[in-house]
Amino acid sequence: KLVYDPFAGSGTTLVEANALGIDSIGTDISIFNVLLSKVKTADYDIPLLEKEIYDILKRLDAYKNKFSKDEKVNKLFSTKNEYIQKWFAPNTQKELLCYSRLIKDYTYQDLLKIVLSRSARSARLVTHYDLDFPKEPQTKPYQCYKHQRFCQPVEEAYKFLSRYTIDTLDRVKEFSKIKTKAKVIVNHADSREVELPMGIDMVFTSPPYIGLIDYHEQHKYAYELLGLKNNEKREIGPAKNGQSQQAKQDYIKGINDVFLHTRKYMAPNALALIVVNDKYGLYKAEDAGFKEIGRVERHVNRRTGRREGAFYESILIWQKI
């Protein structure tokens, strides 16, 4: 049995396949998504991880106490990066950069990078109700729609770094109880041309929605802090391309190219389950070498941030022909 996700994203398909004892492969054009998927599905020496987790927090706390007293320490953790200077308060910058510098001393560097990026997301100068698509930094107190009161801009990262470091350890421990020895492979590549093994039994994926999200821009805090390579020019259907007729044509060509390529590696009669928001009716199974044998509609009511209107998804069930 082999499951494939050509739009691996944060690795949900890979995690669930492993828990079920099924070998899986994921591909994503975003190196941040690849890093996240690898961290979620990696094997860990739990006692060593626990030791490293508490050690980095202890060292961060020691440096944190010197920030207001020692100018040499302050200079160690400064940056000329315009994005970091714009979107993080001065003290937040120091704490994030300190944690970042300490990561190189540990075995599980990729996991600590994910903790850093997760903390950075929460520690930005943004409103609590607009973590997904902030347009400008929030530097003054504001009326918070999420908490129904006035809230202050975030001025520290330490509370997030501490909370998420421990939380990540807890998540790894929890997943280790059900993790199997099933293989997980994560490719950093374009799904339209990536080389795959023959005999894929099932594709389970959720392609990007047309004109909704600029996926690299959405995680820019991670790209800037971790120095990751940006591949946004290879994204399919990014928000900046809009939802014009031309954008729709480009989008569905990109999607069909992915499935036509993937199809070559699939077993006879193999299934593809595709979660989409197909309000424009762009998905035609026959154009990608499949036939549609079923469709399930679902209302999505668990989302971060404030978004207008009801949101629906379809689960397309396609079979290779």
What residues fall within each predicted segment?
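Conserved phosphoryl-transfer catalytic core
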Residues: 32-102, 227-241
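Conserved beta-strand segments of alpha/beta enzyme cores
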Residues: 23, 183-185, 291
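Conserved proline-anchored active-site loop of SAM-dependent methyltransferases
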Residues: 3-20, 24-31, 37, 112, ...
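SAM-dependent methyltransferase catalytic-core segment centered on the flexible catalytic loop
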Residues: 197-202, 208-268
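Conserved Class I SAM-dependent methyltransferase catalytic core
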Residues: 99, 109, 240-295
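Class I S-adenosyl-L-methionine
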Residues: 277-321
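Short amphipathic alpha-helical segments
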Residues: 38-39, 101, 215-218, 285-286
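SAM-dependent nucleic-acid methyltransferase catalytic core
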Residues: 91-204, 210-213
